[in-house]
């Protein structure tokens, strides 16, 4: 609720970094204006974390990346609430908390570094140096793990499963959702959380007004489940989980 969010405005900020592609979110001033236009500035202070630079943090899995490049303002925080909109994605197949912690926390050049699986950090040349699909997905998992290692156990993960389009919010003309909203899931394990959301999508029985087939096809065509499989393999978390449902009257 917006009023409750406003009340938290002094204790939390909405953070992300500039994009590695064109548009209003690639430049800090325009990015802040876009956040204001969409109402984010009304509920929290907005921090573009790479507005004043970037720094590198170590990665455990060095198959593709030597380090992770994140916004300099990450140093200002000692915990993180990773709040993601779970949906499809043109490149990753789907986007959840792992992608949010990887691409979302990376600076613009860090995004280029992940998308190219370590080939370049040059934003102007990344689209000519895109990695193979699995290498890209594995790089996302590795960089998400780097951020998890940076914060330790001080991260809460939340996926909001509404407006379940096959396309990401970064798409200027996303496809209209063909599925009904599912709910909000939270965990201290990002791998378990994304896996649970995937399972809920796959479990839908297609019916009029609630067709999961386009989203499943998007995930399958991009080999999207490899992200959680590889994330588990490198030790970011576990795909095993227990789903506990909270009814509205139980919510605090």
Where are these regions (language model features)?
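Single conserved hydrophobic/aromatic residue that forms the stacking wall/gate
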Residues: 1-12
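Extended, low-polarity segments enriched in aliphatic/aromatic residues
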Residues: 10-252
